[in-house]
Amino acid sequence: MKAQKYSKEGKLISEIELPSALFESKLSVASIYEAIKAENANLRSGNHATKTRSEVRGGGKKPWSQKGTGHARQGSTRAPHWVGGGTVHGPQKRDYSYKVSSKLKHKAVLSILNKKAQASAVKVIEDLDPKEYSTKSFDSIFKNMNLRNTGVIGFLVQGESDFVKKSVRNIPTVKYINSKRISCRDILYNRNLVITEAALNEMLTQYGATK
């Protein structure tokens, strides 16, 4: 599969062949589903909780006598049918985490890359090594690539680059992605995936080998 290659300024240079080990593996929708499901589940805190009648403060005294008042008998003001009472079958704290094997995630990443390449949504750019923070310069790069108003851009760079990360985070449609910590959500939920040459080589080392 082919992809467009851009200069550091965002100018189109040529069309290159993408590594087949990364972008031509067999598409597995099931693997993508399981990996995304696990990542979404792991983002949930699970700290929601309601109080039952035994946990709500107060209500120890019987509201009124059992007989002779004309009211229905009541044992506590914290019964579920009272205002301020406990909750029946309400949500309780739980662990939503869902684990998948590294082999499945590996397969999911390659499947997503394949899907992106088929949709011509993968762009390769020369390595960027800024020496200062500049949102304006990165905004200009994406404008030159004609990607600025096309939707979310996944910007995949090698390692943790503080200058790059802080420069692009003020651009609402750009998602910074560290090649050392790739998540399926990051590379899937975007309209275009822009990859630096160094990040592409690192991905080839990490995901290119058959598992």
Swiss-Prot record:
The keyword Transcription regulation does not apply. Residues 44-94 are annotated as: Disordered. One of its GO terms (cellular component) is ribonucleoprotein complex. Pfam families: Ribosomal_L4. Keywords: Ribonucleoprotein, Ribosomal protein, RNA-binding, rRNA-binding. One of its GO terms (molecular function) is structural constituent of ribosome. It comes from the Bacteria. Coiled coil: none annotated. PANTHER family: 50S RIBOSOMAL PROTEIN L4 (PTHR10746), LARGE RIBOSOMAL SUBUNIT PROTEIN UL4M (PTHR10746:SF6). NCBIfam families: rplD_bact. One of the primary rRNA binding proteins, this protein initially binds near the 5'-end of the 23S rRNA. It is important during the early stages of 50S assembly. It makes multiple contacts with different domains of the 23S rRNA in the assembled 50S subunit and ribosome. Part of the 50S ribosomal subunit. Belongs to the universal ribosomal protein uL4 family. This is Large ribosomal subunit protein uL4. It comes from Leptospira borgpetersenii serovar Hardjo-bovis (strain JB197).
